[in-house]
């Protein structure tokens, strides 16, 4: 079903700018057409995010309520006990999640913390869930240790374009982020990497971010596209909200540039109406965080997400290795039927 020739790592700025400049309907049509060549258009991956260590981060990311530099009313919490994390993971699985993501507000994990986080990874994997972590910058040895524990994904976002980055963060360089991503790849883990929209950047910065992601030697397997949640006490608390159509355009371009990646509709969904989320799915978003909280910010209630899925005819994506033989047969039959349908549409238009 997929077309490998569509997967490229040599995009030019001019090409990406041309995609952003397409009429809205044309852009979404192209994104949806490509999406259907690589994914079931009516399935969305469901992940759950758990904050395993909250607050007191020494970094100065202008959007983040967990920075120790800002007075956001967030209380510092110690690293969560392994048993508690695994309880959260079990609850996530029982609610339908297939991936469990764990986030810690660190610049980078300390040596004394590694036995605890690797124990969390092993416990999550034993439940049959995919495991993802975001712990800040990690070196080669830490990446190897996490990989050996069974970690599937490591999240480390680029946040924005190289040009706008210095306006948002000064305590960690863009190259620091790229180095961590290289360490993750070298250890054999999958990469989760995206950015945040609506931080005051312009379209050229959204072009620049997606260009960085799409021209990596291997595309991130997961690309979270976040909408800024302007938290009181952070430098961006008064930031004007991004036009939803600009947000949808970014998702659509991400889908076209990285056709094999899961594009995650991530932070900011609490402030999106159902119509905006439906457009995001049509533009190629096929992953969400499920649960009432994302680290420290609100997220739509779980039953609200399932109600929206039902209205749109969307089903939660299942992990391939956990599909039954009958489900695999049904999937193959569906793909054959879709291929035949595509051929009919093609002939009708010719």
Curated annotation (Swiss-Prot):
GO terms for biological process: biotin biosynthetic process. The gene is bioB. InterPro entries: Aldolase_TIM (IPR013785), BATS_dom (IPR010722), Biotin_synth/BioAB (IPR002684), Biotin_synthase (IPR024177), Elp3/MiaA/NifB-like_rSAM (IPR006638), rSAM (IPR007197). [4Fe-4S] cluster binds at residues 57, 61, 64. Its cofactor is [4Fe-4S] cluster; [2Fe-2S] cluster. Pfam families: BATS, Radical_SAM. It catalyses: (4R,5S)-dethiobiotin + (sulfur carrier)-SH + 2 reduced [2Fe-2S]-[ferredoxin] + 2 S-adenosyl-L-methionine = (sulfur carrier)-H + biotin + 2 5'-deoxyadenosine + 2 L-methionine + 2 oxidized [2Fe-2S]-[ferredoxin]. Pathway: Cofactor biosynthesis; biotin biosynthesis; biotin from 7,8-diaminononanoate: step 2/2. This is Biotin synthase. Keywords: 2Fe-2S, 4Fe-4S, Biotin biosynthesis, Iron, Iron-sulfur, Metal-binding, S-adenosyl-L-methionine, Transferase. Its EC number is 2.8.1.6.
């Amino acid at each position: 079903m997929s077309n490998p020739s569509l997967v490229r790592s040599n995009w030019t700025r001019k090409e990406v700018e041309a995609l952003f400049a397409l009429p809205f309907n044309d852009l979404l049509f192209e994104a949806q057409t490509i999406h259907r060549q690589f994914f079931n258009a009516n399935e969305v991956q469901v992940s759950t995010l758990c904050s395993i260590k909250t607050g007191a981060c020494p970094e100065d990311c202008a959007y983040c309520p967990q920075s120790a530099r800002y007075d956001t009313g967030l209380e510092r919490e110690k690293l969560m006990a392994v048993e508690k994390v695994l309880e959260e993971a079990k609850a996530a699985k029982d609610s339908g999640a297939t991936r469990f993501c764990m986030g810690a507000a660190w610049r980078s994990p300390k040596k004394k913390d590694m036995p605890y986080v690797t124990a969390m990874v092993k416990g999550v994997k034993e439940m049959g869930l995919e495991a993802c972590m975001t712990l800040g910058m990690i070196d080669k040895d830490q990446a190897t240790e996490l990989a050996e524990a069974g970690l599937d994904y490591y999240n480390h976002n680029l946040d924005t374009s190289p040009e706008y980055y210095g306006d948002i963060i000064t305590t960690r360089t863009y190259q620091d982020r790229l180095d961590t991503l290289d360490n993750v790849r070298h250890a054999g883990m999958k990469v989760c990497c995206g950015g945040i929209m609506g931080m005051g950047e312009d379209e050229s910065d959204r072009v620049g971010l997606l260009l960085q992601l799409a021209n990596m030697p291997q595309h991130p397997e997961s690309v979270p596209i976040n909408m800024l949640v302007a938290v009181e006490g952070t430098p961006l608390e008064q930031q004007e909200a991004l036009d939803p159509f600009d947000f949808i355009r970014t998702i659509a371009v991400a889908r076209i540039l990285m056709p094999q990646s899961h594009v995650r509709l991530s932070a900011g969904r609490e402030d999106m109406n159902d119509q905006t989320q439906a457009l995001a799915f049509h533009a190629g978003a096929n992953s969400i965080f499920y649960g009432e909280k994302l680290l420290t910010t609100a997220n739509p209630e779980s039953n609200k997400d399932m109600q929206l899925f039902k209205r749109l005819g969307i089903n939660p994506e299942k992990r391939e290795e956990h599909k039954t033989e009958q489900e695999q047969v049904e999937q193959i039959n569906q793909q054959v039927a879709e291929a035949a349908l595509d051929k009919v549409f093609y002939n009708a238009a010719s």
